């Protein structure tokens, strides 16, 4: 990272979605969209870097003609959206995923497995979200996801030998969250991150958005020093450290702000656009 105000040679901008760029689940503001267009016109690649799996990235981004590459599943998979193919992966071994699921089987949880660009969950989970899982009304948009359903997640893993890009748990009851977290921390081979106070995200040990950014830069022949990252939360720390310039929105966590080269306006005030305008286009 750097702190100088000198002109930067930014060739790629990797940006988090939730809490950094999007307003709500799938709304891209006009200012943020224009900032992306201006960056593209300046020859800068604009790359979503998200904890979401490939098919959960909203059309407001995937339908933009200049969005070609995406870091997904917190670095578990990097996609060429135009060609609809995976460029590189860092997957959780099936055996490790089964160890994780063995813990989950002791609780009533909303669990998602991200496998080859799609979300997999237990049949009926979205229907129970409002009651059993207690989803708050403002989060109901999470229930509109296009899932692959299974009756038993352990059986699914055994039968398909799936190697997940990421495992995601949403809206974990506070009464059991510390216990679940403690049990997961005893397992080897996994990386735990948090994008909200009530979720847990699991990747392969050593996998994060930063390692994926390095991989994508290598594929494209770009020096990571010429990359800019924009984020807000714990799952963004890896790429904020990996990029040559790190911008954190005003609503970001203190740990992210502490490693930022610049702290910009909050997400809701289009801090992403501010970062692009001030530090990539000058």
Where are the model-predicted features located?
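Short, acidic loop-to-helix structural element flanking the phosphoryl-transfer center
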Residues: 26-43, 89-96, 149-154, 206-218, ...
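Conserved acidic, metal-coordinating active-site core of Asp-based
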Residues: 103, 107-110, 114-230
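Asp-based phosphoryl-transfer active-site loop
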Residues: 9-25, 100, 240
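Mg2+-dependent phosphoryl-transfer enzymes with acidic/Ser/Thr/Gly-rich catalytic loops
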Residues: 2-12, 28-29, 185, 200-282
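Active-site phosphate-binding/coordination module
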Residues: 30-136
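Short, structured coil segments at secondary-structure junctions
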Residues: 64-66, 73-74, 82, 187-188, ...
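Short active-site oxyanion
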Residues: 43-47, 66-68, 166, 225-226, ...
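Active-site metal-binding loops of divalent metal-dependent hydrolases
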Residues: 19, 52, 75, 231-233
């Amino acid at each position: 990272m750097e702190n100088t105000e000198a002109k930067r040679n930014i060739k790629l901008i990797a940006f988090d979605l939730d809490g950094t760029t999007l307003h709500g689940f799938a709304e891209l503001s006009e200012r943020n969209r224009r900032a992306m267009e201006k960056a593209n016109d300046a020859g800068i690649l604009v790359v979503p870097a998200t904890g979401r799996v490939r098919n959960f990235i909203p059309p407001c981004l995937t339908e933009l003609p200049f969005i070609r590459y995406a870091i997904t599943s917190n670095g578990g998979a990097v996609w060429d959206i135009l060609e609809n193919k995976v460029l590189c992966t860092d997957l959780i071994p099936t055996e490790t995923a089964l160890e994780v699921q063995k813990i989950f089987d002791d609780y009533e949880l909303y669990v998602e497995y991200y496998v080859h660009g799609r979300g997999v969950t237990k049949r009926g989970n979205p229907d129970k979200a409002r009651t059993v899982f207690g989803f708050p009304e403002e989060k109901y948009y999470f229930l509109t996801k296009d899932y692959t359903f299974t009756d038993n997640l352990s059986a699914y893993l055994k039968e398909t030998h799936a190697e997940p890009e990421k495992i995601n748990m949403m809206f974990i009851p506070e009464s059991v969250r510390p216990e679940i977290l403690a049990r997961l921390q005893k397992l080897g081979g996994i990386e735990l991150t948090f994008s909200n106070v009530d979720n847990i995200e699991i990747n392969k040990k050593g996998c994060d958005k930063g390692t994926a950014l390095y991989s994508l830069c290598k594929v494209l022949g770009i020096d990571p020093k010429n990359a800019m990252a924009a984020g807000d939360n714990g799952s963004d720390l890896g790429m904020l450290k990996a990029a040559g310039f790190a911008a954190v929105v005003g609503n970001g966590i203190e740990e992210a702000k502490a490693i930022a080269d610049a702290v910009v306006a909050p997400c809701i005030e289009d801090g992403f656009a501010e970062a692009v305008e001030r530090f990539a286009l000058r």
